[in-house]
Amino acid sequence: MDLDTITSISTPMGEGAIGIVRLSGPQAVEIADKLYKGKHLLNDVPSHTINYGHIIDPESKEVIEEVMVSVLRAPKTFTREDIIEINCHGGILTINRVLELTMTYGARMAEPGEFTKRAFLNGRIDLSQAEAVMDFIRSKTDRASKVAMNQIEGRLSDLIKKQRQSILEILAQVEVNIDYPEYDDVEDATTEFLLEQSKEIKQEINRLLDTGAQGKIMREGLSTVIVGKPNVGKSSMLNNLIQDNKAIVTEVAGTTRDVLEEYVNVRGVPLRLVDTAGIRETEDIVEKIGVERSRKALSQADLILFVLNNNEALTQEDYTLYEVVKNEDVIVIVNKMDLEQNIDINEVKDMIGDTPLIQTSMLKQEGIDELEIQIRDLFFGGEVQNQDMTYVSNSRHISLLKQARQTIQDAIDAAESGVPMDMVQIDLTRTWEILGEIIGETASDELIDQLFSQFCLGK
């Protein structure tokens, strides 16, 4: 890989207590020393130390910033290269001036994800661990961050490497069979060993895939849409679940004119809550846009919370809306139980059949616990799995595991049908390659570049 030194701001832009400019590469310390004035040259201080001083413009001699500089020497760093982290006061102006000086004196602006890419290319982490870094940064709940951290620590990598090693052992036995075809006992032993080991590999792949649905929910959140006719209490429900007044709650029907979205942790289940504009015919241009977005959100939802008003009898609009959502995963909520009951609960039950029904009062915060328990039960069978398990949460990994399951099954079918071993070998080798794509050992350069381009600058 390139031996140049890269630089970037690694903290969010804007006002804050601290902003960090990070450098990585063989000239990181040398470049920093051209700008830094402190008690000692950075080149002379021990690794993994923080040093007080100032950043000086070498040309004008102007003091740019008062800083603390971290010196981290290869190979015991994230990138396995020399790393310098210049800790500045937070703010846009001075941190950009420091960044510009690092580039003026020899560093190149890092591409998105390039620090993590170097960690991968230098063997510090594999591809699945690199992807988990972004999952960790983007995680919205404690459980999601724990699942990502397990992957960063190599839990998934270790399992994949173990299965690939098992395939290599099978291939070695197959090679013996190909080299000595005249020995029937060798062929019989090879077939027996191949089938036994291949079925174990398939079983492990299936076990990982079984975690995929829950893993994806933990990674991305359960897309949960709150739907109902206007003014049934959808926004109040959103506010109670997120305990934040983001949605506008008024007595005027139709005041939610956009799709409002929040993440919330409901009894260990990360929900991506979406409050929609009421779905109805309207001549208002702005409201029409909100309704269209609501329909799109419904089509992409994992769970729908269908809200009815206890204070009003069922209307044709309620029936029409329920027809739209009834074939999805739905929980029906009769809200405003604090008001006079004008809805016929038996009529509601006739309409929804076996769909779960919860009665709530968002004003008095009644029924919220029952709703949260129902959400958990619907998707996790009443028990959220241990977060220390190895989950597969990445869509790319799930797709590759499905491909590997198919190719290992092809090898099993071929062996059981008496297909020549050199043909079985093709399916086994392909399985080994597919699993290698998960951890990056057989991934193409184009795929690697594409994955890291999705990272943020400075990471």
From Swiss-Prot:
Cofactor: K(+)
Binding annotation for Mg(2+): 235, 256
Residues binding GTP, per UniProt: 231-236, 250-256, 275-278
A Pfam cross-reference name: MMR_HSR1
Binding site for K(+): 231, 250, 252, 255
Residue positions binding (6S)-5-formyl-5,6,7,8-tetrahydrofolate: 22, 85, 124, 459
Record keyword tRNA processing present: yes
MF GO annotations: GTP binding; GTPase activity; metal ion binding
Main location: cytoplasm
Domain TrmE-type G: 221-380
EC number: 3.6.-.-
Sorted UniProt keywords: Cytoplasm, GTP-binding, Hydrolase, Magnesium, Metal-binding, Nucleotide-binding, Potassium, tRNA processing
EC primary class: hydrolase
GO CC annotation, single: cytosol
Location(s) in or outside the cell: Cytoplasm
Co-factor: note: Binds 1 potassium ion per subunit.
Hydrolase listed as a keyword: yes
Biological process terms in GO annotation: tRNA methylation; tRNA wobble uridine modification
Subunit record text: Homodimer. Heterotetramer of two MnmE and two MnmG subunits.
PANTHER family: TRNA MODIFICATION GTPASE GTPBP3, TRNA MODIFICATION GTPASE GTPBP3, MITOCHONDRIAL
NCBIfam families with a match to the protein in the record: mnmE_trmE_thdF, PRK05291.1-3, small_GTP
Role noted for this protein: Exhibits a very high intrinsic GTPase hydrolysis rate. Involved in the addition of a carboxymethylaminomethyl (cmnm) group at the wobble position (U34) of certain tRNAs, forming tRNA-cmnm(5)s(2)U34.
Family the UniProt entry places it in: Belongs to the TRAFAC class TrmE-Era-EngA-EngB-Septin-like GTPase superfamily. TrmE GTPase family.
Name of the protein this chain belongs to: tRNA modification GTPase MnmE
Species, as recorded: Staphylococcus aureus (strain Newman)
Gene that produces this protein: mnmE
